Amino acid sequence: QVRGINFMIPHSFNPKSPYDRDYPPYFYNDGHEPRFPLYKVWADYTSRLSLMLTGGKHVCPVAILFSGNARRVGEYVTPEDMTTVLQDALYDCDWLPFEAFVSDASIEGNKLSLHEENYKVLIVPPTEVIPYETLAKVKEFFDAGGTVVGYGRLPSKSATVGKSSSEIVNLRNAIWGTNPEISNKACKTSTASGRSYFLPEKPDVKTITAAIKEDASIPPVIEVLEGETNNWLHVLHRVKDGKDVFFICNQDH
């Protein structure tokens, strides 16, 4: 639930229990499930969390651009690994579809707004092919003072009819510069103090922290002032009725 789930639906009920070997049932299991007496404890706990984590306003600093179709037309890396390392570094993030980014998101200075969400960092996925209008809006955000992060590879081909790959390369170079090197320091800055970064395909917590927190001066959702978390601490932040609600979870299983 620390990753954003706020409505739990139990499943795996099986009328053939306990004799179905293909899909063995859980929960009651005709009285054969020894953990069932504790199910109410778990269900009550998740119900309380669902109530606390529903409504209000989600506070999230990072948006990851995402496309389910980009991998069909060229090299593409899905955002799961980047999502995990961001959360390990105590940065919450949302996946933002290309289409929603272009049509619904607005740029307000160095922030990207979508409905009630406000993002300070925009991450462009490692993709070979990208729609022209998507990358053009990334450049607009960078020019307005936003922080843009690429990793692994930068786009080089157009997914838009009538727009050439050279036009994509021109936009890419305007954001990250020509032949940027992988570094936790900014590749390029805009006149409005926008910053662009090019990180490795699988960055670690140290790299994320060095680039986003230390170089771009964008703090994580919370900071651990004393002790070691071994990168297992994840956090979700909402504002409800004018009060901050933080759900802090130890993911070390």
Question: Model regions: which residues?
Answer:
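Carbohydrate-binding surfaces of carbohydrate-active enzymes
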Residues: Q1-H253
